[in-house]
Amino acid sequence: MKIAIIRLSALGDIIQSAVVLQFIKKFKKDIEIHWFVDEKFEGILKNHPLIDKLYALPLKDKKIIQSLRILLEARKNNYNAVMDLQGLVKSAIVSRILSRNNFGFDKNSLKESFAHNFYNQKLNIDYNENVFVRYLGLTSFMLNKYFDPKDLAFKEDVFSVDEKLKQLLSEKMQLTKNKKNILIHVGSSEENKIYPKTKLALLCKLIIKEFPEIKIFLGWGNLKEYEFAKEVIELGAISQDNIEIAPKFSLEELIVFAKSMDLIIGNDSGPTHLAFALNRPSITIFGATPSYRNAFKTNINKIIDTGKKITNTKHLDKSDFCISTIEEEDILKLVKELFGDE
């Protein structure tokens, strides 16, 4: 059996979607899986052991003709089934080009409801439902095999780690000389999803006061986030022995570094969600985005939110900065809980 999975973007969504791979392979080891991703995010899935062939489409660069050529060539693979985990019009069209036997969500289960017109097989599942439940639900629907979301608590790492690179990074960053290493991702895709720098600086000070032998690394993805991280250190007046800005990582290096951490803290963003994918302890900070939908809680993967009820997840209020009401002390409590009050 040969199937194709469509999940073009963005980083966090690809990281979360990739969990279905191990469920599929455990069900039937010999299923051949091809994955279609945007060229920009190819690095996160490159050399994935459960993906038999990865197709990178230059859609973000608006290279439509080139993308179409790749798709028409891939269509010759004669897929038994194609599954669109993205649920947008462009991803639905991609799935339709690849096969008539394509699976997606129905019009009531999509943000871009028009996309349902391109699917042959459609699943009804509430758009407000947890994303992992949605992804596993569509996978179950395609393979006619029930996958229990509760099994996510026992999943294997979603991404494999290059042990040689892990050792090199550990030596370069001198990780072994610290009792604990914490990675804090400062950014996110929207301003209102970012924990304020003044509060983050205070949180770092509180953590260091509680755990003097730890090292905090501030993760960033662009120049704006780099400047943000610099300001956090300046505002907190924190010693370089305890905090530093992480280097600019490739996606492969980010996976390896995340796996080396004792704790990862961050906003609702791709790099933060990588912690859950790699079974590393984490705290995800939610403001105006729904924690019940965008994350999966486990004993080691904690969430903190404002307690605000977000019922319409299709239309989130980008002017809502309620994330700033979350107290640093409440995040510290979760850190202490995960570190066992050492």
From Swiss-Prot:
It is a peripheral membrane protein. Glycosyltransferase involved in the biosynthesis of the core oligosaccharide region of lipopolysaccharide (LPS). Catalyzes the addition of the first heptose unit to one 3-deoxy-D-manno-octulosonic acid (Kdo) residue of the Kdo2-lipid A module. This is Lipopolysaccharide heptosyltransferase 1. Pathway: Bacterial outer membrane biogenesis; LPS core biosynthesis. One of its GO terms (molecular function) is ADP-heptose-lipopolysaccharide heptosyltransferase activity. ADP-L-glycero-beta-D-manno-heptose binds at residues 188-189, 193, 225, 268-270, 273. Its EC number is 2.4.99.23. Keywords: Cell inner membrane, Cell membrane, Glycosyltransferase, Lipopolysaccharide biosynthesis, Membrane, Transferase. The keyword Aminoacyl-tRNA synthetase does not apply. It catalyses: an alpha-Kdo-(2->4)-alpha-Kdo-(2->6)-lipid A + ADP-L-glycero-beta-D-manno-heptose = an L-alpha-D-Hep-(1->5)-[alpha-Kdo-(2->4)]-alpha-Kdo-(2->6)-lipid A + ADP + H(+). One of its GO terms (cellular component) is plasma membrane. Belongs to the glycosyltransferase 9 family. One of its GO terms (biological process) is lipopolysaccharide core region biosynthetic process. It is found in: Cell inner membrane. Can complement a S.typhimurium mutant lacking this gene. It is an enzyme of class 2 (transferase). Signal peptide: none annotated. It holds the Pfam family Glyco_transf_9. It comes from Campylobacter coli.
